Amino acid sequence: MSKNCVLKGTLIQLENDETKEIELLKAGEKLLSYSIEGIENTQDVSLLGKTKVNNFEGEFSYQLIKNIWKNTFESYYKINNELSITEDHYVICKKNDEYYWIQVENLKIGDSLFKLDNSFEEIKDIQKIEEEKTVYNIQVNSIYTFFANGYLVHNGSANCPNVTDCYACYHA
């Protein structure tokens, strides 16, 4: 069962070069997304990782936030001391000149992740941390990616089955 999320406090890239902590986002705000040519644009995580491309090209766009989900998760991964993310969350990976979506738990030292500055950063440190934390995910309207602490991540399924609290972004 999927709980693909990022931790509370993660900065999400919005329009106009603005960033905001994920837990402070509201429905109707626009976040920065990235569509990759040749890789299926789907919210169905069962299809992710099945397509690999040898030429990485894509396009930045802005997507409307529809919902934000809050949950707890008993462990997470910390990548390069910058990105804290649950094990089943998908990130775009470069390995051996191939590009594809991969679950965080399958990443290895030496793999590279796509960054907001249009570059790939090599993973030099990845740690699994066994500690319960509050986590969040975002539902957007069409391109199912966003930048979390500067890394491109996929938002997974809109029908996240373990969501305990669907905010619908009703922040007072």
Task: Please state what every model-predicted region is.
Residues M1-P161, D165-H171:
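HINT superfamily self-processing domains
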